[in-house]
Swiss-Prot record:
The gene is FKBP12. Belongs to the FKBP-type PPIase family. PROSITE patterns: FKBP_PPIASE. Keywords: Cytoplasm, Disulfide bond, Isomerase, Rotamase. This is Peptidyl-prolyl cis-trans isomerase FKBP12. The keyword Cytoplasm applies.
Amino acid sequence: MGVEKQIIRAGTGPNPSRGQNVTVHCTGYGKNGDLSQKFWSTKDPGQNPFTFKIGQGSVIKGWDEGVLGMQLGEVARLRCSPDYAYGAGGFPAWGIQPNSVLEFEIEVLRAQ
């Protein structure tokens, strides 16, 4: 599967380019294998938007590839197969089981 994108709200700006610092709001779903269960959000109390260098492998592959295909201001849901998420190791601290399909709702706030 890789990464599948469903647009929730279209963007109006340009797509990010590899190597840019991209800032996003993100909510991740798939805790304990249940795609309706949130495991993390930048919108939770005490959290802030997340910034990463796109296309450099600093985040999961689903984010690197999925966000490259998004426009500034776009909100989309990305469904990531295990090999595009946390793979065989999962992410136990967040309740992500090994080989889990995950979904992320991402809003692209900035790219520079």
